[in-house]
Structure formats: structure tokens, C-alpha cells
Amino acid sequence: RPWEKLVELIEADQPEQVKEYLQSMKTEDIVLSISRLEKKEQLLLLTLLSPEDAAELLDDIPEYHATDILEEMESSRAAAIFNELDSDEQADLLTEMNEKEATAIIEQMEPGEAESVRRLIKYEADTAGGLMITEFLSFDKEQTVGDVVHELRKNAEKYEDYNLQYIYVTAHGRLEGVLQMRDLLMASLQARLDVIVHSDVISVMDSATLHELINFVNDYDFYGVPVLNDDGVLLGVVLRSDILEAKSELASIELLETQGIVGGEELRTMPVLLRSRRRLSWLTVNIFLNVLAASVIAFHQDTLSSIIALAVFLPIISDMSGCSGNQAVAVSLRELSLGLIRPFEVARVWLQEFSVGLLNGIVLGVLIGAVAYLWKGSLVLSLIVGGALMLNTIVAVSIGGTIPLILRRFGADPALASGPILTTITDMFGFFLTLTFASLALTHFGTI
């Protein structure tokens, strides 16, 4: 277990050995080891490392772990570490931290770093402004290639962590175009940048949403994209890697929300009360939704007591219809995230899902009807449960495909609310169909 060796080195107060051991570890082993350390050991670890090495370590671990450690650290030490982080990482961590602690850290950061991060934390995390970095190469169009080379050589240490693939050319801060490093290498030192610049540059606004950025990386295979404000001023660059990382995080959050866990990422190292509260948010709502569905059974309890066999098939009809509906929900959520459908296309999606629901409903209805007939030898019972499952599947699939679009149209989170709403509808409708058909059969035939 890698964390045991790490604890030994921390307790022995051996910073060089700690650094060497961390460098020898895989990223996943580092993440696991940090999660196994006690809080005091985590703090001591970051104290033993240099600010630069500590920043590199924090970049590897989940944001929750990083902010949890930094909030317990002296603000001066935390500020020294923040100075070594990329600007987007600074903003991400500070927005997750306690406001008082975050303010104290910003006040002790280097003036340039503090000014940069203050601008970034004003943006929503899932916008271009919130994802962009401010470490990029930018030069005025009137400068020469020689000026650029001189600046890069003079401040080599400053630019060592910058990506030197692209150089952005500006005029009074406004983006004019872009150059690749090879353009500089092939040009004369006396050449002005406005002569060799590529002016047909693609950019995004600082208010661009994550979904718009995802569409961008799907359309263009760029290292990154420059971010502008309404006046065309170059503010930063959103890296392709950061967009893909944000996309992955969004998918993880949506997966948790479909299971009724709200409030973002959950890790078992988080406080028990926080984890409990996030899970209870929808569990408590589900109590009332399930009571609503169960009320249908209560209304038909005389029918159910007369035909005990129905009690066996009710959960099957409910579960199978729910599974079919959730498949449609998953497809709609996926297509919404990819921009393949729009919230106003409810009728189109309903028609497409209705045909699938009809076909699958017939197949599932025949199968469950055959099971009922083989078990009880009753044709009426097989028609009741088969017909109920067929119709409920059609309803579940048709509605399941449209619920995410309707929720998105009204500004609600489709990943969070689609599942509980669909479950309630399929349960109520499935119970209603089965028990209503059974009541009619009893009235007409007297027995089943």
C-alpha cells in the first residue's frame, strides 16, 4: 500500500525523499494515497514540499481534496502555492473554498497573480471566461519578430510553463490574429508581426457556455481558442484539454444526478452529513412520489384482493416500463449534451420514440402474457398483464424521450428530475392499467 511508505517519509521529516517518492508514483497512486492520509499528514506533506512541487501535487488530486487541505493551511503558505498554479486552476479552487479563506489567500498572493484570479472568479465555472487561462503569449502587431525573440529569451523563466505553439497578435489589446512558432522561425527578425500574422482567427466570447465550447472542439482540432470580451479585447485562451476535462466532469455530475445525488461530485472522504444531505435531497421527494403512485393501488384494493396473482405482475409491469422509459431518457440526455436536438423539438422526439415504444411494447407484452398463461392457464389474465405492459411501455418510452426536453425548456435540470418524474408516471399508469383491466374483467366475466 503506497500511502504507508509516504506516511513514514512524512513522519521522518524527509522532504527530498518525499519528493522523490511522489515522482516515482503513478498519478492514480498519488490520488489514492492522499485520500488515505489523515488531515494533519496532508498538511504536513504540503509543508514539506516546495510551493512549486505542492502546486504540482494539488493539480493531480480532486478539487474537493485540494480545497479541503488548503482551507486548513496558513493563508500565507497557501498563497505561495497558489502563485505556482495555472490561472484556471487558481480560479477553480478559490471558487470552491470558503469565502473568508479564499479572500485571505488572494490578499497574500503576488499582485499580478491576485489581479488575474480576481477577474477569473467573476465568471461562471462552465463558461469560456471561467475555463480560460491567462498564461499565453501576446504581442502588439507593431512589434517585430526580433522583439518577440528578445522578450522570450530575456524572460525565459517566466515563459517556461507557457505553451509556445501559438502567439496572439493584438492592437491596443484587441485580437488581430495569430502566429505559430514556425512562422517566427521562418521570418526575418526585422519583419513586423502585422505583416506575417494570420488574421482569419477563430475566437469565442467570454460568455460562451460549456456546451458551445464542446461543439467547438468537436468541429475544430485546435490546441485552444482565444477568448474575447464584447470589445474584442483578448482576455485569455481556453485549452482543448480543459474543455474535454470539463465535459468529463459534467458527465460525471449528470450520472450522479440521474441516481438522485445532487450538489455535485461526491467522494467517500467527504463529511458524512454533507453526503447524507445530498442523497436525501431527492430521496425525500421520492417518498411523496411513491405514495402518489401507491394511491392507485389503494383505490383498487378490492380488485387486487380478488385476484392475488396480479400482485406478482404489478412490480414486473412497473419495472419493465421504467427500464424502457429510462433508455429513452438516456438517449435524449445524450443528444441534448451533443446539441443534436433542441428543447422545442418535443413533437419530433415523441413521434420517433412512439414507434420504438410500440414495437418493444408488443414484444414485451406478448412475452409477459405468455408467462402469465403458462403459470395460471388463464387467457384473461395473460391479456390483462400483456396489454397493460404493452400500453405502459408505449407511454414510458414516449414520455421518457420528451421529459428531458420539456425540463430543459423550462430551465430545470433534466439529468436530475427526469428519472423520478418518469418513475412516478410509469408506476401510476402501470398500476392503473392493470387494475382497471382486471376490474373490467371481473365485472364482465365474474372471475379470471
Provide a role label for each language-model segment:
Residues 1-262:
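Hydrophobic packing positions in regular secondary-structure scaffolds
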Residues 27, 282-290, 313, 317, ...:
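Alpha-helical transmembrane segments in multi-pass membrane proteins
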Residues 115, 242-276, 326-350, 405-411, ...:
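Non-transmembrane, extramembrane segments of multi-pass ion/lipid transporters
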Residues 268-285, 343-362, 386:
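Soluble-to-membrane junctions at the N-terminal ends of transmembrane alpha-helices
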Residues 270-340:
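Core alpha-helical transmembrane segments of integral membrane proteins
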Residues 299-313, 376-387, 447-448:
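Membrane-water interface of transmembrane alpha-helices in multipass transporters/channels
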Residues 407-426:
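Interfacial loop-to-transmembrane junctions
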Residues 435-448:
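Juxtamembrane boundary at the C-terminal end of a transmembrane helix
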